[in-house]
Amino acid sequence: MPSSARLSVLGLAAALALVLNAHAESRPRYGGAVMQTGPLADLLVDGDPLIRSLHRRAGGNAGLRQLARLRRMTHLLRFLRQTFNQLATRRHEPHIIPLPRGTERDGRGAGLLTAARGALGHWISIRDGAFDRYQVITPTSWNASPRDSAGTPGHWEQSLIGVPVRDPDDPLEIAHVIRPHDPCLVCTVHFLDAGGQTRHRVRLGV
């Protein structure tokens, strides 16, 4: 959740600069810092008064994340109406003008947008008219990123640190923290005791 702007409104130069290495998709960072993305992050950045007020009172808890998912839908409905009205005036124009085969140029490009789960980015480089490299960083990659080379934990791990678990054999609190992020994956969390033995496994996600 960048403090000043959404990922989807970055300029092309800034967008291309985000991809630092081949491992960026597994532990992405923004300016070296851990970020979160999703409806709550979007509404906080957009300055939604209700969400900001509730966030100041109680922080980014599970209930507020669920409310933000519903709240953002009301914003999207208004945006869709505006978009459809604009498209209606240009419905006879082509959506894309393809280049003649063989005239493709070498280059790099990036496409950034806000998907249902948050910031989504696609990066591509073209050489000799063919794809040379392609990379995608999904919203879940931002939120679920593992510790980086500096030892900084990702957003999910930071969210779980210090969460009390009443029953280690039925750690519902872990699910309550992660599921409101709407993870686009299936992950299994292994709980180890002090002796390093697996005590419990929890399957999360879709």
PLM regions: where:
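Metal/cofactor-centered catalytic core regions of large enzymes
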Residues: M1-V206
